[in-house]
Amino acid sequence: METIVTGVLLGGTYALIAIGLTLQYGVARIMNLANGETFVAACFIAFWLFTSYAINPLWGILVIAPVAFLVNWAIYALLLRPLVDRAKSQGMLEVDSILATFGLLFLFQGLMLRGFGGAYTSYTFLAERFDIFGTFYGLNRVVAFGAACVIAVLLYLFLYRTRYGTAVRAVAVNPNSAKLVGIDVAKAAALSFALGGALTACGGTLLSTFYTFNASMGVIFTMKALIIVIMGGVGDVRGAVIAALILGIAETAVARLVDPGLTLAATYALFVFVLLFRPQGIFGRQQA
Amino acid sequence: MLRKVSMMVAVSAAAFVMATGIAAAQDTLKIGASAPKTGPLAGGAAVTHWPNIKLWVEEVNKRGGLKVGNKQMKVELIEYDDKTTADEAIKNITRLATVDKVDFIVTPYSTGINVATAPLIAKFGYPHITTSAATDSVPEFAKRWQNSFWLLGTSKQLAEGVADALKKLRDSGAIGKRVALVNVADAFGLELKNAGKPALEKAGFEIVYEASYPLGTQDVAPIISAAKAANPDAFVAFSYPPDTFALTEQAQIQKFDVGAFYVGVGTAFPAFAGRFKDNANGVMGVGGINASAPEMQDYLKRHKEVTGAVPDAWASATTYAGLEILGQAIERAGTTDKAKVIAEIRKGPFKTVIGEVNLKDGINHNVWAVGQWQDGTFNGVASSGLSGAKAPVKKQPWK
């Protein structure tokens, strides 16, 4: 029981890491390698708000998410739109966007180093005991899990229950056909990219309450997000959440019952397993 | 074509003559530093390494520079980021030696990169005073590279210190003999575990839980709950900063109360006490300083003034001491001749912030192994050959 709860909480953490990239990669078709840097930047801003102005990170989200939305919109409009416009094929856009965001990664990392230095940073927020079935869990992790659920549900409702969400999904499935039915593909893609950035920033803010981070750690989060996004099926939010939960529970079970040294092996074994039997991901669609 | 080439040769020859001409007349001492500003170890270097270089250079220049023979030479520092990779460090050091033509270099940061660059530094003939490398191969390395000096001790010393501190606690009746032992699965964690486990067993402890976890793990709830289930009297983790913090927070959350709680690198960081406040009290970790020694108190004060931050209570002071030794050796040699300075370093002894240091065989044998947070100071509680150790105290339950 304890293992399952710990695993589910960890899964929530992973979902927060991955959900933004799902939108950016799945809908906007941008493989954003600077995703982890956005994540860490949010950690730093949450830390700064908390230590300098005593702003609770949960309120901090209200500032950080809109800022991240605007910044990511600007990145898409200024940096990535030209790539999208000139790309002759999906493959070309993927290569170009990987190269561009790879550069962005170093820019962000450099800015964070300038601004916050290279040292490990952490703070204590809600590091209290929270009792579930007689075992103690960190309240900050429970809160992050709760927020992950809220974000996932809101996103689901937006994508599957609103008209605009349907348009966004149409773009994810086939950008060319979406144009034919009168969807403004460029705008939908920009919105998804910006929204993805905002969600990534939410994740960073929440994780900063229990993770120790520094300016060069972004790539760790990008890697984890990438695994989850591919396992879940590119562009499918439900898939990403389920993949995150599976990874969380599997890692915890292996760490608790077998050996903590094998958690990475478990992650990659699951990844290989999914790629072998469902290369399109858990919820992914077979490419026509 | 031929004329063009000979013209170029002439120009570069002229430039060369000019460059060497300037070098001969210089009154500045060029010192090069290559260490991580980015990459996995940037976090540690930002606390332990860079601030001490800054402090030393500023202080030396404030008092007019180093007295080399009959010249006062100010120090000019050239810094490069090695991105925490050995490849980059090797490029940087080659550049420092051949392009910047520095007179001396500051040690790189971390065991791995120091060992990887040691042959190159030996080839260029620079004194190599390592202050952040702790490995069991130190005696072998010190013999192999006669220009190298090792100040931070060996993994064995650090790990045996743990057994030593726990034994003191057991003898005083504070804890029993059950120990849970975990380590991060990289060279540092493995070496410490391989030395620590037999040392603990020899001291009569029983290992009731043992596990390792991958580098970078911060989700340590399962590790703490498994350790807790084994019902130990002491918890020992040979960990790195992010996991050191995570393990401590999880132990606190799960109310994992033991009489002795030891975590690895990062415990001695001021940020550790800053984050855990009262709960840091009684936590033991790698390192330690003799906080009551006057030269150490003076160092802590100056470090705070110049860099704006409190140093960590382990390798920071050692890093500073390494630079002090370099400076003193240059002044004693009265020349920037590298071989003569190396010979001077071997001669010793040096008065430093970590006390008197002798490097006859290239190794500093007197090091702190274990420290403990006691009312806001990280006091050394176990060492090899040093005096001033405080008695370890029993860890009180988490608040």
Residue spans for each PLM region:
Chain A
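Membrane-interfacial amphipathic/re-entrant helices at transmembrane-helix boundaries
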Residues: M1-I17, I45, N56-G60, A87-D96, ...
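Single transmembrane alpha-helix segments in multi-pass membrane proteins
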Residues: M1-T51, L78, V84-Q90, G233-V234
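Inter-helical junctions in multi-pass inner-membrane proteins, predominant
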Residues: M1-T6, L10, L159-R163, S192-V229, ...
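Pore- or pathway-lining transmembrane helices of multi-pass membrane proteins that form conduits
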Residues: W48, V84-M112, G218-I230, P260-L275
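Alpha-helical transmembrane segments within multi-pass membrane transporters and channels
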Residues: A54-L104, I242-L247, E251, R278-P279
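Transmembrane helix-bundle core of multi-pass membrane transporters
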Residues: L83, M92-R161, A188, A253, ...
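Helix-loop-helix "hairpin" substructures at the membrane interface of multi-pass membrane proteins
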Residues: F136-N214, V237-A243
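Cytosolic-side transmembrane-helix boundaries in multi-pass membrane proteins
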Residues: K179-L180, D184-K187, V258-A288
